[in-house]
């Protein structure tokens, strides 16, 4: 059997493919602020609609945020909020 007949397996390294949601949100926030937009309104617009036009290309923010699924971003935001506002 030739090597062309075998199925190849492609593996991603978890470390290299893992995008840090926190870092991406901070970069996107800063890019929006630098361009004169209200960062919170724009990020919420993107999360609700999925339309990347809410995020500028400035500082590669649009490409960065699109690498993360919107539900993953929302999950991280909820986790962070609850951790910060938990009663002891």
Curated annotation (Swiss-Prot):
List, alphabetically, the Pfam families matched.
Answer: IreB (PF06135)
Domain of life according to the entry: Bacteria
Q: Which InterPro entries match?
A: IreB
Q: Which family does it belong to?
A: Belongs to the UPF0297 family.
Q: Which HAMAP family match?
A: UPF0297
NCBIfam families assigned? PRK05473.1 (NF003997)
Q: What is this protein called?
A: UPF0297 protein BLi02868/BL02032
Q: Which organism is it from?
A: Bacillus licheniformis (strain ATCC 14580 / DSM 13 / JCM 2505 / CCUG 7422 / NBRC 12200 / NCIMB 9375 / NCTC 10341 / NRRL NRS-1264 / Gibson 46)
Classification lineage: Bacteria, Bacillati, Bacillota, Bacilli, Bacillales
């Amino acid at each position: 059997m030739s090597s062309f007949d075998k199925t190849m397996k492609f593996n991603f390294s978890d470390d290299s493919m893992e995008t840090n949601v926190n870092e991406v949100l901070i970069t996107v926030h800063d890019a929006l602020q630098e361009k004169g937009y209200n960062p919170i309104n724009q990020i919420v617009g993107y999360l609700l609609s999925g339309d990347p036009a809410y995020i500028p290309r400035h500082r590669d923010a649009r490409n960065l945020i699109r690498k993360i699924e919107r539900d993953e971003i929302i999950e991280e935001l909820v986790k962070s909020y609850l951790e910060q506002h938990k009663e002891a």
